[in-house]
């Protein structure tokens, strides 16, 4: 994938951005590239929405996450507004141990839990994105919460890497 193609895909998704150099893309068989966004991390992969969503579910399970809730945004918009909308799914996910620890430190943490992972159709493929848990939990104070957020964030990064690499996954 050429640098200009990457820039066009990102611009289509959210305005101007810069993609990593093309030689880094040659190493990835899935034609994926990852970037940070203001409040999360994301990767574009050359898979349709349903296959990308299946890969994410698999990767979440592999990394110990529980899917607490799921919202099919495309269907919701179609059903409630009568507007055709491309595939867009929001998953509410948590690491049970981390959630328990956070709630023991601050019962009101439930206001920002679970963490969100999204999968949506974009430019002949899909985007997989996850919230930056450190940024999400920054509104709460406490050194112990920062460590819980750091661990959760690292595991979400692993989920995105695993889902975009196709390692150990068959649709």
Task: Give the ranges of each region predicted by the language model.
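Compact, glycine-rich, soluble single-domain proteins
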Residues: 63-119
């Amino acid at each position: 994938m050429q640098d200009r193609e990457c820039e066009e895909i990102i611009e289509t998704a959210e305005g101007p951005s810069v993609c990593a150099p093309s030689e880094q893309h040659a190493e990835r068989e899935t034609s994926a590239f990852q970037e940070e966004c203001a409040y999360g991390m994301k990767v574009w992969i050359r898979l349709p929405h349903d296959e990308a969503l299946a890969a994410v579910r698999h990767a979440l399970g592999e990394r110990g996450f529980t899917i607490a809730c799921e919202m099919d945004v495309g269907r919701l918009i179609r059903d409630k507004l009568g507007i055709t909308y491309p595939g867009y799914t929001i998953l509410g996910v948590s690491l049970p141990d981390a959630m328990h620890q956070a709630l023991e430190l601050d019962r009101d943490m439930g206001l920002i839990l679970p963490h969100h992972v999204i999968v949506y159709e974009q430019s002949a493929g899909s985007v997989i994105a996850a919230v930056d848990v450190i940024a999400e939990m920054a509104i709460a104070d406490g050194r112990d919460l920062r460590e819980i957020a750091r661990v959760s964030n690292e595991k979400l990064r692993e989920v995105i890497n695993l889902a975009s690499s196709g390692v150990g996954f068959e649709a």
